[in-house]
From Swiss-Prot:
The keyword tRNA processing does not apply. Its EC number is 2.4.2.4. It comes from the Bacteria. Belongs to the thymidine/pyrimidine-nucleoside phosphorylase family. Type 2 subfamily. Pfam families: Glycos_trans_3N (PF02885), Glycos_transf_3 (PF00591), PYNP_C (PF07831). The keyword Transferase applies. GO terms for cellular component: cytosol. GO terms for biological process: pyrimidine nucleobase metabolic process; pyrimidine nucleoside metabolic process. InterPro entries: Glycosyl_Trfase_fam3 (IPR000312), Glycosyl_Trfase_fam3_N_dom (IPR017459), Glycosyl_Trfase_fam3_N_dom_sf (IPR036320), Nuc_phospho_transferase (IPR035902), PYNP-like_C_sf (IPR036566), PYNP_C (IPR013102), Pyrmidine_PPase_CS (IPR017872), Thym_Pase_Put (IPR028579). This is Putative thymidine phosphorylase. It catalyses: thymidine + phosphate = 2-deoxy-alpha-D-ribose 1-phosphate + thymine.
Length: 507
């Protein structure tokens, strides 16, 4: 049977036209609703389609564009899809229905409370790693697994599936150390300092870090203001072989790649459940070849972990999952009642790190002391020093300048050390009355920093001027908001005024 004349007359050859639409790593294709392919295939908005250019292909979400942006024979792609397909203007594009995803059955089952087996979790994670899921599917999976709905067995299987989704590194050392913080505490940028101290003391630390999930900066975000962090596996090995440590972004490596996809959606949801947190941390460490991992868990009323009961539940989960993979972990409880250091946001936190490593008199004392505590614990845990002697060794390494020299070596090996930038716009938030600081809300401060543009805008964030129990006078700056755009500054300031992050009691 012949096609209707109006359809037959339409061109059935699709070419790529760049529009520069950034969907933050979600693959999207844009087509005219009246093009021959859309009509013939019955495509509707939000359909999942397979897009092919030459030998490269991916699964994308379809958006229909009825305006004059696209001719009927043209398609466009989101920036991430362009990069994956290496698309160039005029390339011939083939679009067809995406294969049905059998693993979505497991996601639906989990939504209704089912326990998933090893095969089901491997299937879900495999499809996520291959970018076959839309963000809405990933969000459904994350939500279904949150709120204590994952058993220990499921968490172990999830971790294994995430490890299996990528490559694994091996090292010819009996002890391979690592350090991680569960997050939730603004400014707690101890990892670069701990890595520098421990590596200068002789430990091997192939440290890979994630970007921020629910916070205004992750270690990778902060380090990116100082040096190159997107290293390949070959480059990472070269850096570690040369200087004994790295401070790289795990997302640039194929180590638990499913985790990086999950983190992107977790950031949008502002959700980080115990099971997902454990699987995320440990899958990366296992894939990196770590044997001994120190995990910093800040506990406080507005931190991610809010009570000793929550801490104990997380500790047991982390230890049980790690044990099943033959990895040793030690959990260190730290104070989560207020931010650490002065800066909140990538560049501001980087300045704090540099101040501590360079032994500046103005360096944040709390960041220095916490870093020394964690470094000392890691040195003792790995047997680099006798029990009880770690703090003396860590302090000596830092105060002698050896840690700073090691940090310089790491940065130079990764591409060179640079100076963090500064924000164009700043605004003080001041005390409205005389009194004493009785509470600092970590979550409000994190939200203020994120509204100012962090971590996407590296120089954005919050600079703290007070700590708990400080005496303040009316009009004294409590913190300064840094932003790179005036609109983001005003948005952040408005939130800060409506949601006070610093509580002051009159004296």
């Amino acid at each position: 049977m012949l096609a209707p004349p109006e359809v037959a007359a339409l061109p059935d050859r699709l070419t790529f036209k760049p529009l520069g639409i950034d969907t933050w790593q979600e693959h999207v294709i844009y087509m005219h609703p009246d093009c021959a392919i859309c009509r013939a295939e019955g495509f509707t908005a939000q359909a999942r389609v397979e897009v092919r250019i030459g030998l490269r292909s991916l699964i994308a979400t379809l958006n229909l564009v009825g305006s004059g942006l696209l001719e009927m024979c043209e398609v466009s792609l989101s920036v991430s899809a362009v990069e994956t397909l290496m698309a160039r203007p005029g390339d011939i594009v083939t679009v067809s229905h995406a294969p049905a995803l059998e693993s979505l059955r497991a996601v639906r089952a989990k939504i209704y409370g089912a326990h998933l087996d090893t095969h089901q979790l491997a299937s879900v994670v495999g499809d996520i790693a291959k970018e076959r899921y839309a963000d809405v599917h990933i969000a459904a999976f994350l939500s279904a697994c949150a709120g204590g709905r994952m058993s220990v067995k499921e968490t172990i299987d999830l971790t294994q599936a995430m490890v299996d989704s990528g490559e694994c590194l091996e090292w010819d050392r009996e002890i391979v150390a690592d350090k991680h913080c569960v997050g939730g505490l603004p400014g707690n940028r101890t990892s670069p300092i701990v890595v520098a101290i421990a590596a200068a003391a002789g430990l091997l630390l192939p440290k890979t870090s994630s970007r921020a999930i629910t916070s205004p900066a992750g270690t990778a975000d902060t380090m990116e203001t100082l040096t190159r962090v997107a290293l390949s596996a070959t480059e990472l090995r070269r850096v570690v072989d040369r200087v004994g440590a790295s401070l790289a972004w795990g997302g640039a490596l194929s180590l638990s790649p499913a985790d990086d996809v999950l983190i992107r959606v977790e950031r949008a949801l502002d959700v980080d459940s115990d099971a997902q947190l454990a699987a995320s941390i440990l899958s990366k460490k296992i894939a990196a070849g770590s044997t001994h991992v120190l995990i910093d868990v800040p506990v406080g009323p507005t931190a991610k972990v809010r009570s000793l009961q929550d801490l104990e539940r997380l500790r047991m989960l982390l230890e049980r999952v790690a044990r099943s993979f033959g990895v040793r972990v030690t959990i260190v409880r730290t104070d989560g009642s207020q931010p650490v250091g002065r800066g909140i946001g990538p560049a501001l936190e980087a300045r704090d790190v540099l101040a501590v490593l360079q032994r500046s008199p103005a360096a944040p004392f709390d960041l220095r002391e916490r870093s020394l505590l964690l470094a000392a614990t890691l040195l003792e845990f790995c047997g680099a020093v006798e029990q009880g002697a770690g703090l003396e060794m860590a302090t000596g390494v830092l105060d002698s300048g050896a840690a700073w020299r090691k940090f310089e070596e790491i940065c130079e090996a990764q591409g060179g050390l640079r100076v963090p930038g500064e924000a164009i716009f700043r605004r003080d938030v001041v005390a409205e009355q005389d009194g004493i600081v009785t509470e600092i809300d970590n979550r409000h401060l994190a939200r203020i920093a994120k509204l100012a543009g962090a971590p996407m805008r590296q120089v954005a964030g919050v600079e703290m001027h007070v700590r708990l129990h400080d005496q303040v006078k009316a009009g004294r700056p409590l913190f300064t908001i840094h932003a790179q755009a005036s609109g983001e500054l005003e948005y952040s300031v408005a939130y800060a005024l409506m949601h006070p992050a610093v509580s002051i009691a009159p004296t």
